[in-house]
Curated annotation (Swiss-Prot):
Source species of the chain: Rickettsia akari (strain Hartford)
Entry-linked CDD domains: AdoMet_MTases
Pfam families attached to this UniProt entry: Methyltransf_5
Name of the protein in question: Ribosomal RNA small subunit methyltransferase H
Family according to the record: Belongs to the methyltransferase superfamily. RsmH family.
SUPFAM superfamilies: Putative methyltransferase TM0872, insert domain, S-adenosyl-L-methionine-dependent methyltransferases
GO cellular component annotations of the record: cytoplasm
Top-level division of the source organism's lineage: Bacteria
Amino acid sequence: MLQTHIPVMLSEVLKVLDPKGGEFYLDCTFGAGGYSKAILESCDCYVVALDRDPNVIKKAEEIKQNYVERFDFIATNFADSFAKLKEKQFDGIVLDLGVSSMQLDVADRGFSFLHDGPLDMRMSGQGFSAEEFVNTLEEKEIADIIYKYGNESFSRRIAKSIVEYRKTARIDSTGKLAEIVRSSIGFRKGKIDPATKTFQAIRIYINDELGELERFLMNVKNILKKDGRLVVVSFHSLEDMIIKNFFKENSEKPVARSKYAKDDIIIDPNKWLRIITNKALAPSDKEIRLNIRARSAKLRTAKKIL
């Protein structure tokens, strides 16, 4: 059963996306459909949604029933979506790079250290699982991945504990892994759970989340219309750095000119973006109180000007 999902920074996303009737929007990470539904409700526009998680198809079908002519869903990850989109172009594109509540809250999905279940973490249900990760990789590789993708300073201690544990028993549940991590670095009441960074790192690695983001950005220009907006909500410093650098590398400030001029002057034809949010937006204190998972969110937006 799908759990209630609260779209992070929804009001901010709608404000910068600025949906208009008759326009087309791409929701790259459908999840429980929060962004797609809100965009459809905002005006008489059209939405195409993508997701590689087969568990969201039922929710997509529900939205399709209410918006038969204005909503379509494609079961794919966004990095591999270009061929399936068949040269469609969009007035706005939204990416929410976080793991959804419907994944975290279902124990059998194996994403959460708060709910004991099979150690899986695969968004698509296919490929290399988290259980295989902790039971087969060398200690150094485990440590390097936890450090790189989780920014975990105790990565080597955690990796050593994982390897020591698996000598006597297979690590096959989220509960086992969480306890191994907690016991290796200690648990202090009131602090963020010690297992947080390790679970995050393994999830990012298992699903190639950063690679998928980079592959998508390489081609996003082709599916974004002129004046279209790219809106990205990230939850990890590495994700945000990729987005920040991509915007910076592909954007250029306009030359100072008359306020009566209508068009932007482009010095370099390869600079096709205009950054809308010079500084990443963060969720309000109120939203964080209502949804603690929003605490690390950052929103960046840019507009296509070529």
